[in-house]
Structure formats: C-alpha cells, structure tokens
C-alpha cells in the first residue's frame, strides 16, 4: 500500500469516526432513558409554573401549537405570551386564546434596544411573573407538546433532583421536501449531541425560579443576542447540572420548507455559538467541513473506480466509507419519530451535507445574524454591539 493510500485511509478514519461515536452513544442513552420509563421521577407536589412563550408572526399550525401548550395536564400553571407589538400578526390570535384559556395572558414587551428581541421579550416576561411562581418554563412558539409533557418534564425539579431541565424538538416536514427533511436530519443529529452533553438549545427549558434569580440571568440576557446558549453557559459556570430527558422531545411542524428557509435556519444554528461558544463552533466547523470533503472525494473516487480510473484499494475503501456513512444516516432516521420515508431521508442527505457545508464555511467570514427581521452584530460572548431592521419576509413565520 502506497503512502498516498495510507494517508487517504487515515484521513477517512479521522473524518468518519466522531460521527458514529456520537450517534451510537446518544442512541444508547435514548434507549436507556426509554427503558427507565417506569422509574421516571414522580412528584405529588404541584408548585405554580409559568410558561413564557415569545412569539413573532404566525406559523401555518400556530393556533394548534399554542393550544397544545395551553391544554397541559398540570393543575397549577400559567402561560404568558410575549409579543413585541400590538401590531404583530400573532396578536389577534393570542387575544383569542387568552379569552378561551383564562390561565393565559399577553404581555406587550416593546422593541429591544441592547439585546436580541427574544431576550428582551423573556426579560419582560420575567418581570411580570406571578408572585407564587416557583418554576419558570421557556418554550419556543413553534413547538407542539403532548398533554402530559409539562408534568413529566418538570418532575425532576419538583422532586428536588435537579434545578434545571431541558429538551429539544424533532421536525415534522410536511410535505417531505428535500429541505424539510434536511432540517429534520440536522435536528436528529443535534438531539444526540444534546443528549450526550445536555445544554439548552431550542425546544424548551425549565428552571427553578430561585436558581434563575440567584444566577443573574436577566443581566446577561439584557445585553446578549441569544437566550438558550447564554443560559447554558451561565449554568456551566455555576456548576449546575441540567437534565436532558429525550422522552420529552417536542414536535415542530415544518410545512413546505424551502432552500431559503433551511439556509436561514442553519445560519442561526451555526452562527450563534460562534460568539457564545467559539471553541465548540470552531471544532464543529473543522469536523463538518472535513466530513463533507471526505464524502465528496470518496464519491468521486467511487465513480472513477467504476470506470477503472483508480486502483481497487482506494475504490473499495471509498465504497466502504460511503456505506458506513449512509448506515449512520439511517440510524439518525430512528431518532426522528415521524416516519419520514427512507427514500426521502436518503435523497435529502447529500443536499443536506453540501448546503450545510456551505453555511459552515460562510460562517467563518460572516459577522452578523439575521433573525426575525432584525440584523444583529454580536461581539464576544454574544453581546449585541449593534442592530438594524433587516428583511421583513424573514421576520415572521419561522421556527426559532
């Protein structure tokens, strides 16, 4: 075997091994969590919980999504909808829901000046909490929950086992467009990362109110561009363990996702940690671009091998690599609960890899984030340096 062939072998192993290790460990933890279903935390205490839901614009299934959060089997909870302006398209919908569900209310927060609008909304909501609220739940307005979700996810806090819990979401693309399935693939992989290293990242997070106040989260949020990663860093610095329960994953309907919508989603996912968690971002960029390049090169080698243009070692090595890659992709499909057809899942994988690779590469050179109609320029730690109104089309109807 030549030096070049040895080099290719080592490179392929370096590019491939982290993915199956992460996927395998994450799936093992999910399996263990589900087998412990009978041993899950149970509490006969029902302290008051408030769910804070920042909302901007209306998704196609918005009313059904919000109703799922208003119809929880928990005897003592309130829901607070946080809206920037009375003119927001979601305002009338929220008014109707607050009329139908007396345990809900709407808070007009005004426009952010020194932080992300979502952070500004959440800070305003914190300042309007009921006196008796003991647990605060932060939940995105794009997530749908089962009726027993609030009871199950907050049980570890109510028993005193932990001070904070988090969960993620799975995307349900309808129809199964390439870009909707691509987003579901990315979320499946991200879910496994969060299972391995629990951290608030989309979905929902609950925290004991005393803990939240003690950590000074409001001060951090009031100058930062993002809420969940910032909260995760605060918890890490304080040495507070956060529990991730994969049985409480939320559903995010994803109707008719487009390439533009997918790229916009990926921009946020990749760019936020560039400022809040730069080491994680840099490692992810290197790993992902290396994997994307390895998939591209081995695909070319396989085509050349079929035409007799490369030797059998490189040809078969590339074939084995691609088979293993697609095997891992099929394992990821088991993480998504919505039975996306195999053909749609596999057909979306290569477009997902290369478009996401482009977004990762672009993130190296981009110094701003477009989010809900505003363009933010963050600095170290995610602190907002400046902001301006951006594309209004991107400002509404997008999952957080």
Residue ranges and their predicted role:
Residues 75, 83-94, 111-113, 143:
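A conserved acidic beta->alpha catalytic loop
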């Amino acid at each position: 075997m030549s030096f070049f062939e040895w080099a290719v072998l080592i490179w392929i192993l370096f590019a491939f091994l982290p993915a199956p290790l992460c996927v395998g460990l994450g799936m093992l933890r999910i399996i263990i969590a589900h087998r412990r279903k009978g041993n899950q935390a149970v509490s006969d205490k029902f302290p008051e919980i408030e769910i804070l839901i920042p909302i901007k614009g209306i998704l196609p299934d918005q009313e059904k999504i919000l109703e799922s959060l208003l119809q929880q089997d928990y005897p003592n909870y309130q829901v607070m909808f946080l809206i920037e302006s009375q003119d927001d398209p979601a305002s009338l919908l929220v008014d109707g829901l607050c009329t139908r569900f007396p345990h809900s209310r709407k808070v007009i927060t005004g426009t952010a000046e020194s932080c992300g609008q979502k952070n500004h909304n959440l800070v305003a909501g914190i300042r309007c909490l009921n006196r008796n609220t003991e647990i605060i739940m932060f939940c995105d307005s794009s997530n749908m929950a089962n009726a027993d979700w609030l009871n199950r996810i907050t049980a570890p806090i109510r028993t005193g086992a932990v001070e904070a819990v988090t969960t993620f979401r799975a995307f349900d693309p309808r129809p199964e467009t390439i870009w909707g399935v691509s987003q579901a693939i990315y979320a499946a992989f991200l879910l496994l990362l969060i299972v391995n290293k629990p951290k608030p990242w989309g979905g929902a997070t609950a925290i004991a109110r005393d803990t939240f106040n003690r950590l000074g989260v409001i001060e951090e949020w009031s100058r930062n561009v993002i809420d969940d990663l910032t909260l995760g860093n605060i918890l890490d610095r304080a040495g507070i363990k956060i529990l991730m329960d994969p049985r409480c994953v939320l559903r995010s309907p994803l109707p008719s996702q487009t390439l533009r919508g997918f790229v916009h989603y990926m921009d946020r996912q990749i760019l936020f940690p560039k400022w809040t968690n730069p080491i994680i971002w840099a490692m992810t960029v290197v790993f992902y671009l290396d994997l994307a390049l390895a998939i591209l090169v081995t695909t070319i080698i396989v085509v050349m091998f079929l035409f007799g243009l490369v030797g059998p070692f490189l040809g078969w090595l590339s074939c084995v690599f691609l088979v293993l890659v697609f095997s891992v992709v099929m394992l990821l499909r088991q993480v998504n609960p919505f039975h996306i057809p195999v053909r749609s899942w596999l057909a979306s994988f290569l477009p997902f890899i290369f478009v996401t690779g482009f977004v990762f590469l672009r993130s190296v050179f981009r110094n701003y984030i477009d989010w809900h109609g505003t363009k933010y320029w963050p600095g170290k730690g995610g602190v907002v340096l400046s902001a301006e109104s951006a594309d209004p089309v991107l400002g509404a109807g997008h999952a957080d």
